[in-house]
Amino acid sequence: MAAPALALVSFEDVVVTFTGEEWGHLDLAQRTLYQEVMLETCRLLVSLGHPVPKPELIYLLEHGQELWTVKRGLSQSTCAGEKAKPKITEPTASQLAFSEESSFQELLAQRSSRDSRLGQARDEEKLIKIQEGNLRPGTNPHKEICPEKLSYKHDDLEPDDSLGLRVLQERVTPQDALHECDSQGPGKDPMTDARNNPYTCTECGKGFSKKWALVRHQQIHAGVKPYECNECGKACRYMADVIRHMRLHTGEKPYKCIECGKAFKRRFHLTEHQRIHTGDKPYECKECGKAFTHRSSFIQHNMTHTREKPFLCKECGKAFYYSSSFAQHMRIHTGKKLYECGECGKAFTHRSTFIQHNVTHTGEKPFLCKECGKTFCLNSSFTQHMRIHTGEKPYECGECGKAFTHRSTFIRHKRTHTGEKPFECKECGKAFCDSSSLIQHMRIHTGEKPYECSECGKAFTHHSVFIRHNRTHSGQKPLECKECAKAFYYSSSFTRHMRIHTGEKPYVCRECGKAFTQPANFVRHNRIHTGEKPFECKECEKAFCDNFALTQHMRTHTGEKPFECNECGKTFSHSSSFTHHRKIHTRV
């Protein structure tokens, strides 16, 4: 059968208007919602090719001004692209008549979500068939759109309805709408609720004052998503969701920050962004008083007090505070790598790793530190780097009071108190505190050495060792001690050296109270108390507390004497013996 002809659509049909008295009944939230819905509708029509007129009503909408003095003077336009002739009349104190078939009732009922959602009203005496893709003008403002990009679908149509849809419609007056709005307020007793909301959902018990509202609510339980995007086939429950979704395809970002010019697809995101400029933090934790800009951050923070980790991995039993962390973790089990490089085809599990990899092709590092000139590809890396200059350490250990610049370092540190080592090697059973250590360890089994020196061709298992090696070619020692001017290749060496000047000994033995400057010395000392000797000689099975002692012992089997005296040519197996020998030559 041939497709039905497109019906004429009047722009007047998509405008909801009020008298001055009706406008006065609306609170600020309802007026704001009205403005957003109308502007959303206008933008949708424009994006679909409608030559929508922009009279004074629309001008006032865009500028957030009062609307009750505006009189509608709008002419018709068509989906087929006929030219519209805007007609603007002088503002008067009397406002336009409110259309009984408008969606005012829906706007008020849905004001809390601040979304323009399409209501499907039902009149028991009225069942209207509408041609597919063409909705009757005047039934609902959001339905009057061209069906080129959006379509309405329903799975349970009778055979004779294959070309039509059933639209449930009810006439709603402003008084009905305001009554429903008031009846949903706080302080109502159960009897009043039952009288005002006679239509009850059998699934969840929620009450509604109108039958059409109950029907629409029951779509949630039924899983009905009648609005489908013709670009990708995604289905949505509400028209407003389709409108927002379409911006993914069009790239439209209609909400622009007047402070910095950044644009957003949703007004909600703009509102949150503007708090960066205003410093507003409306979400405050009752436990500790910490305030947050975003509600999502506030909810995540609250979980640190409740210790709730609602996202549980069924594969390994690990639980997570955040759905994003859970989703990333699940990729470990599934092996899924969502982010693929268009240049070399390499795939990545995490978006941040993918972005960092892309820099190897583009060389782009847009985040510049004004203090030292260092650049970064990720804003998060830049933020962490800035803490070096500011000295900020936002992550403090509740056990020992030690503070950390990076969250990852803080998490690893906490495991020194708990003894937790959640990352286990499947080859040898060795466990690690963090995933990066496990990845590096796995290279022992695989023999992988991904870091190759372009100067000499030497390859390395660890990135840190590779960086240190590169400095042997450049001679660069970027870390200089301000006390004695000694320079170091590595930050770890620099940190250990600084303890000579400060006298800091952060590693304290719980058994005997002895303190150490270096973590390696602390670990070796602890083995005196535990009796642990993990390093065993394969030749004679003798065991040692540390790897250094094993290395020296192995020279008794190999005969290696790496320490040679420049004065007399004598060689030694141990550095201590070599140092003692040199004193013979230096004696006066």
From Swiss-Prot:
It is found in: Nucleus. Its main location: nucleus. Residues 9-80 form the KRAB domain. GO terms for molecular function: DNA-binding transcription factor activity, RNA polymerase II-specific; RNA polymerase II transcription regulatory region sequence-specific DNA binding; zinc ion binding. PROSITE patterns: KRAB (PS50805), ZINC_FINGER_C2H2_1 (PS00028), ZINC_FINGER_C2H2_2 (PS50157). A zinc finger (C2H2-type) spans 199-221, 227-249, 255-277, 283-305, 311-333, 339-361, 367-389, 395-417, 423-445, 451-473, 479-501, 507-529, 535-557, 563-585. GO terms for cellular component: nucleus. Gene3D superfamilies: 6.10.140.140, Classic Zinc Finger. InterPro entries: KRAB, KRAB_dom_sf, Znf_C2H2_sf, Znf_C2H2_type. GO terms for biological process: regulation of transcription by RNA polymerase II. Pfam families: KRAB, zf-C2H2. Signal peptide: none annotated. Keywords: DNA-binding, Metal-binding, Nucleus, Repeat, Transcription, Transcription regulation, Zinc, Zinc-finger. May be involved in transcriptional regulation. Belongs to the krueppel C2H2-type zinc-finger protein family. This is Zinc finger protein 599. The gene is ZNF599.
